[in-house]
Amino acid sequence: MQSEATRVASLPCIAVTAGDPAGVGPEVVRAALSSPDLARGFRFELVGEQEVSFKSGVPTARGSGWAFAALEAAVAGALSGKYAAVVTGPVNKERMKEVGFGFPGQTEFFASRCGVKDYVMCLTGGPLCVGLVTAHIALSEVPSLLTVREIEKTGLLLAAFLERRLGRLPRVAVAGLNPHAGRAACLVQRRPLSLVPPSSD
C-alpha cells in the first residue's frame, strides 16, 4: 500500500515565487499556501532563499536581486521538469532594472527563458479568460500597436490555448480600445478609430 508521503511526493509540483520581499507578495503567498481552498492535487514549493529579512514597504535593489534569483531558479526547475508550473508574486519593475532584469515584466522574462517568440498574457477568472494584445507599455502607445495583425495573432494564440485546456473550440470576442466610448467613438475623439475584423481579411 502506498504511503501518504509517497503519494504526496508523486504529485505534480508547482513552484511559487514571492516576488518583491518588501511588497505584498510574501504576505499573499503565505496566506494562499495556508488556505484550505488550496488545490490538493499538487505540491507547492516556495522558491528562493528563505532566511532573509527585508523592511516591508521599502523596495531595494537587494530585494529585487533576491526576487530575480527566485525567478531564475523557478524557470530552471520548470525547464528541467522539476516543476509542472510556476506561480509568481509581484515584483518592483523599477528596482528589477537595477539588478539587470532587462524585461518589461515577468511574462516577457519567461518567454525569453523558454525560447518562445509568440505568447500572450492571459487573465483568468471564473469562466472568462482574457488575452491582452498589448501589455507593459505606456497607455499612449497602445493605439499605434493595436493592428489587425496583432489582434489576429493574439486571438489565435488564445484560441489554441483554450482549445487545449477545454478540449473544444472556444468563443473569442474582441473588446474595443475604449469600449465605453460607443460604436462611433463619439465620446473621446472626432475621428473614429477603425479596426477591421481579422476574419474579413
What spans do the regions from the language model cover?
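Contiguous, glycine/small-aliphatic-enriched amphipathic segments in soluble metabolic enzymes
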Residues: 1-107, 145-201
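Conserved beta-strand scaffold positions in the cores of enzyme catalytic domains, especially
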Residues: 46, 119-121, 130
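A glycine-rich helix N-cap at a beta->alpha junction
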Residues: 107-117
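Ligand-binding beta-strand-loop-alpha-helix segment within the catalytic cores
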Residues: 123-157
